[in-house]
């Protein structure tokens, strides 16, 4: 694996917390907690970040922290693919981070693990993407500050589609047909990730359904979703999907190295893909899968939270306010200088020249028109349950209805825990 692939492979693309009862040795995070010694005002803060794949990200985060003069801020840059287990193990110890990045999760709030940040965000709330505000609002309070928005969609090789005489698919049926025509003895048609699970939610959204409804009840178990799973199975069974790629879907190397014609990936990879392929690349959303449905984009991203149990709670909140509310220059740098991410601050997104033209502008358009944001009630156990649906029905060829029934039991059990 190349150095670039190794960097991208460390990107742990997480969608939810594992729960605060997570176990595991904190030693895996490294013995240096940053609590002792060093210069500064006498207050030591520790922040946790997962290891981003984009070059320069670690140096940037540490540069921002070094510029803060009211406390000494130490960064724990967590490598590996189990950032969430290391983070939540650490949160149960005396060496827990004061500040950490993650995704909005209702368990964090119900357990009292994260601090209410409403007072920080309220004065600038109107300058944030309102969907981000909504996804971080639980019980009328705002619990995290969004740092970056990361839309996910399909990249495709224009030349390969042109040679096959096809247009970018607008329906799931067309994607299945395209996979057939694009597959050769050297190139596979489509890459949906080694597990195929990254497109489970987009499939649901593209039928017009959702994971949960407004009453926090199951909304994904529909005939159209079951039919869509059968179509994914067709691509898998017929050998038109790239499987067991050296690097998974968040790494753009499958398409940049010519292993596949169409790849599901994120906007963060756009500069790398364009550098490798030039103008021979386009993008499109997950295509419509049913009558009444519409194309779908996953609007992922990362947010900053404050540990409510921090010994330096006020200082931690002040640092988060300074960096992720006040320092718009750093926020823009973080979003646009290391891969492409959409700034959650509306004023920054609208003024970002790098996002105003070409493929980046198309990505922003897909984000705005077809994006689906985090649902904080959708827990890790629920995510795993739907990953099981893909495993059982797409990879193993089982009955989609039976697979969905199996998932329903887990999801309903989780919903009962959360909402009674």
Give the predicted meaning of each segment.
Residues 118-130, 209-227, 274-276, 285-297, ...:
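Short, solvent-exposed loop/beta-turn-alpha elements that line the ligand-binding surface or hinge
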Residues 98, 125-160, 188-189, 293-296, ...:
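A structural signal for short loop-to-beta-strand junctions that line the ligand-binding cleft
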Residues 32, 143-147, 152, 173-224, ...:
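Extracytoplasmic/periplasmic solute-binding protein
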Residues 105, 268-279, 289-385, 418-419:
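C-terminal lobe and pocket-closing loops
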Residues 2-107, 168, 290-292, 314-315, ...:
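Conserved N-terminal structural module of periplasmic/extracytoplasmic solute-binding proteins
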Residues 103-153, 167, 176, 282-284, ...:
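Hinge/lid segment of periplasmic solute-binding proteins
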Residues 179, 217-245:
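Glycine-centered hinge/linker elements that transmit conformational signals in sensory
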Residues 3, 162, 368-420:
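Conserved C-terminal helix/tail region of periplasmic/extracytoplasmic solute-binding proteins
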């Amino acid at each position: 694996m190349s150095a670039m692939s190794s960097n991208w492979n460390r990107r742990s693309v997480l969608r939810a917390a594992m729960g605060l009862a997570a176990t595991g040795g904190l030693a895996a995070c490294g013995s240096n907690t940053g609590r002792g010694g060093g210069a500064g005002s006498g207050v030591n803060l520790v922040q946790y970040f997962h290891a981003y794949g984009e070059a320069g990200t670690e140096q940037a985060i540490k540069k921002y922290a070094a510029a803060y003069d009211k406390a000494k801020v130490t960064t724990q840059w967590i490598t590996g693919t189990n950032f969430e287990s290391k983070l939540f193990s650490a949160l149960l110890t005396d060496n827990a981070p004061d500040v950490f990045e993650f995704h909005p999760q209702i368990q964090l709030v119900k357990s009292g693990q994260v601090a209410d940040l409403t007072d920080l965000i309220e004065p600038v709330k109107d300058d944030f993407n309102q969907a981000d505000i909504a996804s971080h609002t639980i019980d009328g309070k705002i619990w995290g500050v969004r740092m970056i928005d990361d839309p996910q969609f399909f990249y495709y090789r224009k030349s390969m589609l042109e040679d096959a005489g096809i247009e970018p698919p607008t329906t799931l049926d067309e994607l299945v047909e395209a996979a057939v025509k694009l597959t050769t003895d050297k190139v596979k048609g489509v890459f949906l990730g080694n597990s195929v699970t990254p497109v489970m939610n987009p499939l649901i959204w593209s039928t017009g359904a959702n994971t949960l409804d407004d009453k926090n009840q199951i909304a994904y178990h529909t005939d159209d979703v079951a039919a869509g799973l059968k179509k994914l199975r067709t691509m898998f069974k017929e050998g038109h999907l790239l499987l067991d790629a050296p690097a998974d879907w968040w790494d753009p190397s499958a398409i940049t190295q010519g292993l596949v014609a169409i790849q599901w990936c994120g906007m963060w990879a756009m500069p790398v893909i364009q550098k490798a392929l030039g103008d021979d690349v386009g993008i499109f959303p997950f295509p419509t899968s049913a009558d009444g449905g519409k194309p779908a984009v996953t609007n992922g991203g990362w947010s900053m939270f404050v540990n409510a149990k921090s010994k330096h709670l006020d200082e931690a909140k002040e640092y988060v306010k300074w960096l992720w509310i006040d320092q718009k220059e750093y926020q823009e740098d973080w979003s646009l200088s290391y891969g492409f991410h959409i700034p959650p601050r509306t004023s920054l997104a609208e003024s970002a020249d790098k996002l105003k033209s070409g493929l980046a502008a198309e990505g922003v358009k897909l984000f705005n028109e077809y994006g689906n944001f985090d649902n904080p009630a959708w827990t890790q156990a629920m995510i795993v349950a739907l990953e099981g649906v893909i495993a059982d029905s797409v990879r193993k060829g089982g009955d989609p209805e039976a697979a969905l029934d199996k998932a329903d039991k887990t999801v309903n059990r989780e919903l009962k825990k959360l909402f009674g």
